[in-house]
Amino acid sequence: DMGALKAAEKMSIAMKDKSFAKKCRTLFEKGSEWMDENLFNGEYYEHKITDPKTFEFLDMNDPDVKIPGFQLGQGCLVDQLVGQYMAHLCGLGYLGDKKNIQTTMKSIMKYNFVEDFSRHFNNMRSYVMGDEAGLLMASWPKGRLEVPFPYFSEVMTGFEYCAAVGMLYEGMEEDALTCINAIRRRHDGAKRNPFSESECGHHY
């Protein structure tokens, strides 16, 4: 984890362990560069599925390649930058290319925010319905897997708040408030308990 490496570097410097601090810095720089080069698809970071035997990336566009079930693949995940939001809170700075991070946050809002769930199909738990709005766990602007991970069609407040905080750090105040206000409107005291948000309240 890039955030852990940055934190370890700072702790090593505090403990005057220059050797380990340098090692952490080197690993971070290589890892950060690798993530931007291999996982960023121009709009967001995606999940590269690997062969469990060889650990090589599977070609998800090859119809002859068997893709394991319950994966994310090329989906846009709502909390793909949760580590970045935590790094900002801890004063660790950016874990990847700043422009890529900002582009990803914009893509999460673009692809995952739904203004009206009246026609949204969800085979799992429904924490949002009807004309309510929210951020989906995942969307597939580049094509969905045949058997995606189970919770992609849900909305969970904990993940929405994390994404909104990430947006605030990237200067997307209007989008962040749109997400937060959507949560609060769903938990208005009439439809749901305003003091116990599902996935962010007494459920955990």
PLM region spans:
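Short, contiguous, pocket-lining structural segments
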Residues: F20-K23, L27, V78-D79, V155-M156, ...
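Extended, hydrophobic alpha-helical segments in both membrane/secreted and soluble proteins
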Residues: D1-A8, G31, M35, F159-A163, ...
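C-terminal structured "cap/appendage" subdomains that terminate the fold
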Residues: E197-Y204
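Hydrophobic, small-residue-rich alpha-helical packing segments that form membrane-like cores
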Residues: M2-F40, Y44, T50-K53
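Well-ordered alpha-helical scaffold segments within catalytic/enzyme domains
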Residues: D1-K18, G83-G96, Y161-M172
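Extended glycan-interaction surfaces of carbohydrate-active proteins
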Residues: D36-M156, T178-P194
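A short small-residue
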Residues: A7-S12, D188-S196
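Glycine- and acidic
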Residues: D17, R144-F149, E160-V165, H203
